[in-house]
Amino acid sequence: KVFKVFDDQDSGNICFGTEKDGERYFIKFAGAPTAEYNGTLEDAVTRLKSSLPVYENLKHKNLIEFVEAKEINGGFAMVFKWVDGDCMGRMYPAEHRRFMNLPFTDRLNVFGDILDFLDYTNSSGYTAVDFYDGSIMYDAENHKTTICDVDFFRKQPCVNDMGRMWGSSKFQSPEEYQLGADIDEITNVYCAGAFAFALFG
């Protein structure tokens, strides 16, 4: 049973909240047209498939729990455990307002969870790419931070092979605009600082 649809993504993925046997899941699917995506379905499928090793390799208490991946009718689906909470990202204005109106101590805890996750990411041999406010959820009732999107994280060593890399400009370091530049733990430190400004600025 589908109880929620997210079809306004610019990534080429369409996402669903589903329920089966009393358990809720979040499904990310590439291979169908979405309202905001201008690329090809093939590219969307390729990108989602390339994120599979990231979710298989990174296991952290604040990272959304990966369940399985499937090829379906020429498309590709990734299944995660559903989590409740508000998204920090401005693309969901009502949730963003609730998030930014959290008590200072809650926002401080979110920031601590982000720092811990970035430290874990680096120690696991990955660099955060396209990590921004839309990647963060918070369940105020249970005081739980969830990182819900690490699709574009890169295995180290990583070099900028795009010029303008994926991501929100508010959270991107200078090297994420410079073709051939190293993308490393310094990039993650810049990202952490950007989150501090976003949460407390």
List where the protein language model places each region:
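Catalytic-loop of the protein kinase fold
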Residues: 118-139
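ATP-binding glycine-rich loop module of kinase domains
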Residues: 11-54
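Conserved end of the kinase activation segment
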Residues: 175-185
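Conserved short submotifs of the Hanks-type protein kinase catalytic core
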Residues: 73-87
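Conserved activation segment of eukaryotic-like protein kinases, specifically the C-terminal portion
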Residues: 161-176
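Conserved HxN/HPN-centered segment at the entrance to the catalytic loop
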Residues: 58-69
